[in-house]
Amino acid sequence: MDFITINSSNKTEEFALKQVVKQATSSLLYRLGKTIILASVCVEREPVSEDFLPLVVQFLEKSYAAGKIPGGFVKREGRAQDFEILTSRLIDRTLRPLFPKDYRYPTQITLMVLSHDIENDLQVSALNAASAALFLAHIAPIKSVSACRIARIGNEFIINPNTSLLNQSSLDLFVSGTKESLNMIEMRSLGQQLNALEEPLMLKALELAQKSLKETCTLYEEVFTPHQNELLFKESQGIIFNERLLDLLKNQYFDEIIKGIESSALSERENVFNEIAKKISEAHSEFSLEEIEWSLEKVKKTEIRRMIIQDKIRPDKRALEEVRPILIESDLLPMAHSSILFTRGQTQSLVVGVLGTDNDAQTHESLEHKAPIKERFMFHYNFPPFCVGEASSIGAASRRELGHGNLAKRALETSIKNKEQVIRLVSEILESNGSSSMASVCAGSLALYASGVEIHDLVAGVAMGMVSEGQDHAILSDISGLEDAEGDMDFKIAGNLEGITAMQMDTKMSGIQLEILYQALLQAKEARKHILKIMHEAKEKIVINFSHLPTTEIFNVAPDKIVEIIGQGGRVIKEIVEKFEVKIDLNKPSGEVKIMGNKERVLKTKEFILNYLHSLDQELEQYAIDEVLEAQVKRIVDFGAFLSLPKGGEGLLRKQNMDRCQVVLKEGDSIRCRVISFNKGKIALDLA
């Protein structure tokens, strides 16, 4: 066993090599304080024939890692939690660009949390553990990467804060990359205010992150290189194209290829290129269909990139900084609390808003928190197949859908003034040609306003792209699906006029320089201004229907009266909820009653509850201690009998009093009894 300790970027990491999981291609135990993560890499020796990178990253939390037993009926870890899925995506998006383009060997990277101290950053630790395990596996010429998190408290940036410091921060910036460049970025603003970060300050934070990554990656390479396995798979020369076929495509079919490039819809574009491939295959049998499709793809990609870099024009004829036409419609769904249809080019998001009560909040268990937490603001993103013209059924939410919903939530969360409000936004993507997550942000911000939710400001989102050839590059605003597929970067940025509230950057290159990222940030700001202007114009036309929106009424009663509102077996509260069609939250220790629903019904419910409690008090006032009554047995329970009293109300005759007098009662019997006490609104009886 080899044991390695690395000190960098405000933390001490320990790596135990060759101790466990020895049948994997590589494995290690990562330790940061009391946090221990098992990282393993397994590679199959037979490549797949499909044209994709067969990489799977799985991050798993174990409840025992925090000394817990899983909640719920089944005491075993089951379906992956959102945090596990989002962390898996975070690691995947960092590592995927590092692999050679023609790497086709199925590879599984597994991160299993065995022990965790909530003060440590699980995502940074997991990515660093995965990076080290992959570097040691040496399955291909892959650079070392690392991650860091940047917080901002006051005007000071902090590298790799612990959880306590992050909770005080106005910024949560997660960055990963090599010692030369950045691979992946996740950012969100934090706090009670909007806390949008200005572009120059964002650049300063990214520079600090780059410095930290350079230090850590340099140490990783120095320390881990002597422990690497032998290189398993060398990078090949890639696909060898038939020059005669390429010339044929450029000379005889170029106009048709351009027509396909200019087709805005994915399904339409695929049909055009399928027809071209079929036509060539029939006319030139010496070329295989696969060979033709590969060559078509190469000519298409080369021409798109040439148009953008040399001609400064895009496939849909837009200028590089131009945003597609925007149309915003509101109040489409009469029964929802809000609905906004946001259309940008051929991307369309319908965001529906619904307000709820505390009982509607989503409860999560995670190693990141000591106790289950309540998620009060939910953003759910759905990408049905029909939005891109695909004929397939709708299933459970995919990793991508969870990721896009989380990004939109992060963009909008700090814009909400009242963080205690329970809000669910759902984005239904009805049509997609790129930037659907950013369309969801724009529609979501307006949906919050239309729901009567108080917000600090509107938030808009735009997806930026980049095409790079040698020393030349071009930054694109509001990228389409084709530009996303053929470009080198997908940089989603959301914010208001002052700054950024959330961003996410992925790249297909081995990394991107800070100068290019800053150029993209400034260009995105101009695009955001344009979008926000249209959104503010749409906001002025929104009429909030307050009579339809749910209202919340909060009042207090004596804590011992809460049981009266609940009733035996919940009978009373069920009747109230069914009668008035409202939602009720009760707090037993404080006596707080929270009613939510239609304003008129809420007020009637409050009046009913107060009158009901008053009537119970009046019933008690009619009786005196030691008063003898003729009562009737209403119902028999394990601990005694409830008796209907002659002047209204009921009292409890306990079982021990019945046993003492050797009395056997049945429902409907009449019996003489005596009032012995009043306890928390209840009348206690004894046999007279």
UniProtKB/Swiss-Prot annotation:
Q: Where in the cell is it found?
A: Cytoplasm
Which Pfam families has this protein been placed in? KH_1, RNase_PH, RNase_PH_C, S1
Under PROSITE patterns, the record lists:
KH_TYPE_1, S1
Which keywords belong to this entry? Cytoplasm, Magnesium, Metal-binding, Nucleotidyltransferase, RNA-binding, Transferase
GO BP terms: mRNA catabolic process; RNA processing
CC per GO annotation: cytosol
Could you tell me the EC number(s) of this protein? 2.7.7.8
Cofactor(s) this protein requires: Mg(2+)
Annotated S1 motif domain residues: 626-688
Catalytic activity of the protein:
RNA(n+1) + phosphate = RNA(n) + a ribonucleoside 5'-diphosphate
Which domain of life does the protein's organism represent?
Bacteria
Main localisation, per the record? cytoplasm
Q: Which PANTHER family match?
A: POLYRIBONUCLEOTIDE NUCLEOTIDYLTRANSFERASE, POLYRIBONUCLEOTIDE NUCLEOTIDYLTRANSFERASE 1, MITOCHONDRIAL
State the similarity comment.
Answer: Belongs to the polyribonucleotide nucleotidyltransferase family.
This chain's function reads:
Involved in mRNA degradation. Catalyzes the phosphorolysis of single-stranded polyribonucleotides processively in the 3'- to 5'-direction.
Q: What is this protein called?
A: Polyribonucleotide nucleotidyltransferase
Q: Look up and give the organism this protein is from.
A: Helicobacter pylori (strain HPAG1)
